Amino acid sequence: MEKGRPFAHMVEAVNARAWLESTKERGMALGLEHTARAIEALGLPAPTYETVHVAGSNGKGTTVAALGSALHRIGCRHLSFTSPHLVRVEERVRLDGRPVSTAFFDAALADVHAMAARTGLSLTFFEVTLLVALVVAADQRPDVLLLETGLGGRLDATRAVPADLAIITSLSLEHTDILGGTLEAIAAEKAAIARPMKPMFVRDVADQGARRSIQRAADEAGNPEIGEQPAAAQLHWVKIEPEANYFDEARAMAAAAWGSLTCAEKTKFPDFRGLHWPGRMHEVVRAGSGQRWLLEGAHNPSGMETSCRALQHDERWKNPWALLFGSTPQSEMAAMLEPLVNLCRRHPPVAIVLTEPQFGRYPGVPCTELASALGRHDLQISASFAHPQEAVAWVEAQSSTLTDVLCIGSLYLAGNVLQALGADDDEALSIVAKD
């Protein structure tokens, strides 16, 4: 529960929100200088909490969610920073799994806005929301702060925040134009979150080049540009079965790191069978029709492969079901579609509906392109809609014949669909462990 923070004046809140929206025009800016300067300019008190920094190609948000849920189970207060948000920006800053209130977010945002105006710092949307999370953490004083990287690690804004523990989840080829074209290069970027003399837990990887990169980053941990004295990190490899789904991976990574947290070191890692993690294997049952929607974010080829592998034995495919698919641009669209095509061949859907995710960093892939790509696999498209709300309405109109719906692809699409279904209150957007 939030406590103690004064609200921002209404005019301040409106101005700060307008400024936050304008920062989207700056796009993405890799580098630590602006964030480090902003943290210093905010004059926040020295942290009383432990900070956990999580990176990886897939599953990093789920690991944050699993670790946060476990901390909540033993009574440790935690604040998490994750991205992207599905419906509203407050989701990026969760206190004990629940998005902070609009008033609370606005009060912290007003502080960041005032600092930027005073210093003249030009900040991105991601940097601003990270700084909001740090202001909230300074005010709320949780036991643990959980940070999810946005992209990579070495030059991600979250790297400017001091941390006590680092976690790296599964690695795959993604954002190769920025992070490099090999797993070795990508591993080096992500493993740069290693902190001097602090533990770093890494999902074991078979690629020898990637292993060398991670070992080197651990041996040479520390970034003098942000005041760190280089020294070796404490590297721990975590063995996980290659076929593990994201929740199993997240639980294993969280359990491995558990004993390194001061507030958890004398407790056993709590047992829970799953998570309500918005947009990830997220089920919504429609009142009245009983139509079941399953929302799954799978935003790159390896993510789609893992998701479809987890879904292939689901009992719901014995019922008449529909596929709703939309994606942001992919450098390897054919590889992205292959697992989904295989799922459709194994369990043919009654209808395939295409749409274009809205309000994301990148525009959605046009339905015509998706239809052409899927058509090469002899999959027939039932309907296409530029706007997800129209696609949801079409699928709901078929509820008498379509008992189940799989919405998969972009996380932004999951957010669009949650809004269209009216399943976007704080309860729906909170992270909760399932017994």
Where are the model-predicted features located?
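Residue-level signal for inorganic ion chemistry
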Residues: L20, S57, H78, L146, ...
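N-terminal leader/targeting and accessory segments in enzymes
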Residues: M1-N58, T62-R77, L86-V87, F201-V202
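Short Gly/Thr/Asp-enriched flexible loops that form oxyanion-binding sites at enzyme active sites
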Residues: L67, R154-D164, L418-Q419
